[in-house]
């Protein structure tokens, strides 16, 4: 293999929990001046719109949120700022994940991230610890498609500059991502979802291929495949 493309949530960082979503809603509600339950319900109702390219920028997302909960326009800027902070807090990898990514790149492999992600994640990404550890990242909110849309896999392959058959896709399986990778001509391996048992997941499907305990096992797995 010449490249590895990783999923983000549940793979490189922990998948969010309902409790974390409620805490984020509380912090945003305090800025907007509305109830936590109102923002929490917004998150529940708008997953597709927030991830599929309908709201590609942080400003788009903040405006949509404020208007959806009948907040005043003057809080759109502060809400965008709070969303960015919340995004930054979601992008903190464990030291063992950092080491695994460094190990892959030290072997000359190209490394990328392909994530169903909303605009606050894309906005926070450039200054996150993960950004310096990979060669490229593709986020669904900016790309305008959700996994397993073939366009996402073509995009990450183009940005990695590596043919599909020389690229391994690694993910926890949300969004039918592993079958999408196989359909794109990539090899694929599942990792057990990073996070707690109640972590949020979307679009899980059955997977009968190889499964690793965590991304930390990817470097030795690739060595074993040679």
Positions of the model-derived regions?
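Asp-based, Mg2+/Mn2+-dependent phosphohydrolase catalytic module
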Residues: 1-4, 14-18, 30-31, 76, ...
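N-terminal helical cap/lid subdomain that shapes the substrate entry/recognition surface
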Residues: 1-99, 107
